[in-house]
Amino acid sequence: MAESKAKALQKELSYEYPHIAKVSPDQIEKAAEFANGYKNFLNKSKTEREVVKEVTSLLEANGYTVFDPKKSYKPGDKIYKVNRKKAVLASTIGTEPITEGIRINGAHIDSPRLDLRPNPMYEKSETAYFKTHYYGGIKKYQWATMPLSMHGVIFKKDGSFVELNVGENEEDPVFYISDLLPHLSKKQDKRTLEEGIKGEELNIFLGTLPFDDSDDIKDSVKLKTLEILNQMYGITERDFARAEIEFVPATKARDVGFDRSLLAGYGHDDRVCAYPAIIAEVEAKSPKYTTLTILADKEEIGSVGNTGLHSHFVYDYIEYLSQCFGADVKEVCEKSACLSSDVNAAFDPTFPDVYEPNNSAYLNKGCVLTKYTGARGKSGSSDASAEFMNKVISIMDEHNVHWQTGELGAIDAGGGGTIAQYVAMMNIDVVDLGVPVISMHSPYEVISKLDLYNTYLAFKAFYE
């Protein structure tokens, strides 16, 4: 039976983003395989320092050398630069002159967490604790009553340092923040959800045993804990002032659901974009345009500091790279193009009120192209031009990448920002593209494997 004129016209003029499994079922197995590599990366890389260490090993194993602005480079050469052990840049030299611009892919590798305070240790009621200061936008109540692991670095008086990683191995102890039992939480229950657990209540259990022969001293449990730390690492209490220690969920990335189509883990924001970005970088053997993959720090607190995109370290790198070819950095930036590789909120059917269904990203419909982020009247957004949207969409369509558009929730429901605005400050065209995430900024976020895989395909196409 022939299609009605209305149906034929609707098919020609209307469009809905399809479920990938319905139109490209062959991608299910490919996505699962790609996700296995990502799971391994996620489990090894719980902090920005650990990501840099893991990525540096990957780059060196694939022939990358440390960038030297005094050297000359030719097409196909692979170089990288580490910024203070907390951010990394990687490039493959393209066949086109650098004056034609470079292709940039920028993700961030910091995630919401609990940081140790400079003077963190105390004892109360014969229990030793650490005081923490939360990093990034978290729901504080989500961090209580769950296993935590400790990661970081402590410098000692003699200038040496020790790296910490406690709570990830099965035989390790974990750390813990308490909450009230419901039988005694009548007063606490009247708090707002935001204040259910307060920042000053994010205190981590360390120990409860006193130091031997300690009847005549104060804080004997704290002393016992300090003795253990001194025996393990050779540190004293004063050394915490020259430390960077982070507490993160002591969990592993796991498949979700009977069909294993989803993946839960800590740090999807934004390592779910950082991983496919660096894989696409490594696989770019002979790109037309020189590539620049950015894995930056500090995005969760505004891209501040000298390892965040608000600093000049990326611009300086582009300038030095331009000088290697006798080019003007301003000319290079003006002709360059960038994907700000960051996640967006996936539509959550349990909480539909904060989304506008026609302009939301959905699981299993591909990477999400976000024209603008920000809050209220697009405040804090870059807002990509129609010309650049067309350029990026054309690349993805040409390479059969599944993509969708989406905003960060309904108007005035909240908002957020990415590194796009700081890339735009360098006079570079930029748009956000990444993976939709359920329960973003929680200790255990969820993504779709098919969306992850198509984000990788988008990055690969962008570099090719």
PLM ranges: what are they?
Residues 1-464:
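N-terminal hydrophobic/helix-forming segments and targeting peptides
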